[in-house]
């Protein structure tokens, strides 16, 4: 397993000047080893299954590393202050996020702020999130990307003294994002519909899989209204959003009856927020073969919402009614 790190020399030099009482290069304060234990709950609990019933970690490839960015501030400083120290570590074993990091710090009281995300293998450069400032973590300014687990990320903050007796701390890392996923439950009906439309004899020896190629179809997901794009780790809140965001997803077979239409991650303000989402399904000739009206999807920090329906064979229209007296998962019905 590869494990590398980088120390920001600018912040390190500033920190030394800040803690010394003079510029006497012969008198540097003694540094003490301090161990940060980063613990991650990588499970993404199911929050709600939203079922539309008119009748009644995709796995990441080995070409990515985990990046740990550790900013260290004076305790009780303003949230817009620059860090005293910055450490950047990477690890190539993305199956295990838990990590132990040893730092060398001068005695004092600190706030440790950690951000964890994915980067390209053997690189520490930003991939999905621009992390130049922890006051303004934002999506990289390029074409918006959805339907990728590379957008999964974690944050953690702890305040601790560093001294002869206090030499370690545990940070429980949490996701600042929630995830949603759209699943269509009518893939067999969809294939039969396409075969009938093409006028293909069902008695041929060709299977439905050979006749209907799911790679010919794309799903355009659109956010109606504003989508949160910028996040402040020090306050744990989204701070900006943009309108007109959409992304394109492939259709992925899950089992004999279900396909995944698409999914995404979003920064959450507080514990729960709502996104208005609509989508169109296009065929190889870019014809729209199915579409939805705006659907209000609850997004919960650190959890996953699954939206299920027969999206491939029926247009969704009308409003969404919530069944009020239901203990547990919520069922949404499109009228």
Predicted feature locations:
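Exposed, polar/acidic Ser/Thr-rich sequence context and nearby capping/turn residues
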Residues: 172, 184-188, 269-273, 278-328
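Tryptophan-paired
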Residues: 60-126, 192-299, 332-335
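Short amphipathic, basic-aromatic surface patches that mediate peripheral association
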Residues: 31-61, 184-207
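Short strand-edge motifs at loop-to-beta-strand transitions and within beta-strands
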Residues: 99-101, 167-171
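Bacterial Sec-dependent N-terminal signal peptides
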Residues: 17-47, 182, 302, 320-335
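Conserved "repeat-terminator" motif of extracellular CCP/Sushi domains
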Residues: 170-178, 264-270
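Sec-dependent bacterial lipoprotein signal peptides
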Residues: 1-24
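Structured interaction patches on ligand/partner-binding surfaces of diverse proteins
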Residues: 91-95, 119-168, 247, 285-314
């Amino acid at each position: 397993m590869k494990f590398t790190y980088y120390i920001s020399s600018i912040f390190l030099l500033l920190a030394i000047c800040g803690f010394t009482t003079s510029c006497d290069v012969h008198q540097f304060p003694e540094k003490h080893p301090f161990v940060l234990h980063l613990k991650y709950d990588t499970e993404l609990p199911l929050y709600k299954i939203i079922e539309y019933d008119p009748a009644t970690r995709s796995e990441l490839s080995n070409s990515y590393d985990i990046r740990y960015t550790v900013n260290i501030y004076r305790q009780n400083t303003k949230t817009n202050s620059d860090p005293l120290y910055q450490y950047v570590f990477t690890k190539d074993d993305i199956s295990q996020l838990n990590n132990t990091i040893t730092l060398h710090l001068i005695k004092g009281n600190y706030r440790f702020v950690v951000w964890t995300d994915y980067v390209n293998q053997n690189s520490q450069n930003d991939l999905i999130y621009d992390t130049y400032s922890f006051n303004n973590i934002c999506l990289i300014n390029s074409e918006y990307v959805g339907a990728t687990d590379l957008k999964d990320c974690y944050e953690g903050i702890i305040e601790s003294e560093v001294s002869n007796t206090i030499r370690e701390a545990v940070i429980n890392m949490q996701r600042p994002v929630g995830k949603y996923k759209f699943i269509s439950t009518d893939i067999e009906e969809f294939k039969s519909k396409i075969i009938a439309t093409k006028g293909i004899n069902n008695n041929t020896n060709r299977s439905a899989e050979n006749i209907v190629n799911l790679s010919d179809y794309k799903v355009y997901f659109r956010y109606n209204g504003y989508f949160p794009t910028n996040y402040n780790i020090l306050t744990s809140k989204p701070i900006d959003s943009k309108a007109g965001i959409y992304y394109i997803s492939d259709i992925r077979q899950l089992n004999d009856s279900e396909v995944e239409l698409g999914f995404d991650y979003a920064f959450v303000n507080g514990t729960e927020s709502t996104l208005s989402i609509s989508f169109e399904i296009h065929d190889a000739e870019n014809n729209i073969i199915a579409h939805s009206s705006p659907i209000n999807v609850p997004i919960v920090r650190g959890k996953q919402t699954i939206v299920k329906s027969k999206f491939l064979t029926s247009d969704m229209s009308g409003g969404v009614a919530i069944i009020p007296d239901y203990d547990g998962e919520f069922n949404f019905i499109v009228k």
